[in-house]
């Protein structure tokens, strides 16, 4: 878990760190849900707990709060990786669309002298064949690492917000169907979900947005104009 706290140097390095962070955040969050009686304490007999070298004390501590926090943390880890949770959730909520449109495509279009809205194919072409290739050419490795550092922490908060929303919906459904007793306030839990998304938005506005704008600014004007002219985007 130690390398989880080290900032990634690129997107591929970020992904496994993000999955681990989501696992840990979900585990801690669900433990708090047990403590504040949002979900029941369902214990697991120790004879069913497999011995895992080097992590036995941590597992025993986690299971002291019941099987549900561990089970949901594993579930969150799996959907974080297998379903590419941060990316697909961002697409579903239009975060990626707005990010690309307002912070990358529009500024590049303006610098090329194009003031109209680009269609879907043109926008995809600009992202795939102009923005990404040019950004990869940036030689300042420290600058790139700083960018991924800011993006990494945004995705951590964003992905946790999605998990918090999913858990709220599950708890709400279970309470309505009387599957288990919920002592904690659903309104307070809902406000926590809103707070989580708000913090994600603040992190994006204060760190990711200026870093993205700075990256776009490093693409030379002549490269931008040449690309738009060559691809008949005018």
Swiss-Prot record:
<feature type="transmembrane region" description="Helical">
    <location>
        <begin position="154"/>
        <end position="174"/>
    </location>
</feature>
<feature type="transmembrane region" description="Helical">
    <location>
        <begin position="186"/>
        <end position="206"/>
    </location>
</feature>
<protein>
    <recommendedName>
        <fullName>Uncharacterized protein YmfE</fullName>
    </recommendedName>
</protein>
<keyword id="KW-1003">Cell membrane</keyword>
<keyword id="KW-0472">Membrane</keyword>
<keyword id="KW-0812">Transmembrane</keyword>
<keyword id="KW-1133">Transmembrane helix</keyword>
<feature type="transmembrane region" description="Helical">
    <location>
        <begin position="22"/>
        <end position="42"/>
    </location>
</feature>
<feature type="transmembrane region" description="Helical">
    <location>
        <begin position="59"/>
        <end position="79"/>
    </location>
</feature>
<dbReference type="GO" id="GO:0005886">
    <property type="term" value="C:plasma membrane"/>
</dbReference>
């Amino acid at each position: 878990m130690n390398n989880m706290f080290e900032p990634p140097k690129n997107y591929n390095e970020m992904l496994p760190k993000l999955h681990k962070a989501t696992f840990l955040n979900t585990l801690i969050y669900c433990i708090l849900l047990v403590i504040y009686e949002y979900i029941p304490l369902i214990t697991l007999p120790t004879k069913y707990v497999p011995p895992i070298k080097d992590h036995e004390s941590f597992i025993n501590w986690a299971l002291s709060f019941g099987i549900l926090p561990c089970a949901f943390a594993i579930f969150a880890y799996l959907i974080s990786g297998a379903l590419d949770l941060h990316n697909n959730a961002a697409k579903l909520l239009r975060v990626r669309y707005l990010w690309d449109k307002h912070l990358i495509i529009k500024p590049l279009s303006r610098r090329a002298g194009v003031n109209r809205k680009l269609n879907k194919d043109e926008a995809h072409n600009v992202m795939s064949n102009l923005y990404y290739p040019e950004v990869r050419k940036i030689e300042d490795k420290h600058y790139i690492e700083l960018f991924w550092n800011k993006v990494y922490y945004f995705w951590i908060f964003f992905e946790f917000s999605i998990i918090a929303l999913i858990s709220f919906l599950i708890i709400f459904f279970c309470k309505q169907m009387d599957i288990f007793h919920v002592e904690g306030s659903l309104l307070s839990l809902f406000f926590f979900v809103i707070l989580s998304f708000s913090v994600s938005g603040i992190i994006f506005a204060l760190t990711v947005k200026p870093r993205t704008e700075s990256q776009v600014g490093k693409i030379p004007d002549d490269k931008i104009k040449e690309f738009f002219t060559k691809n008949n985007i005018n």
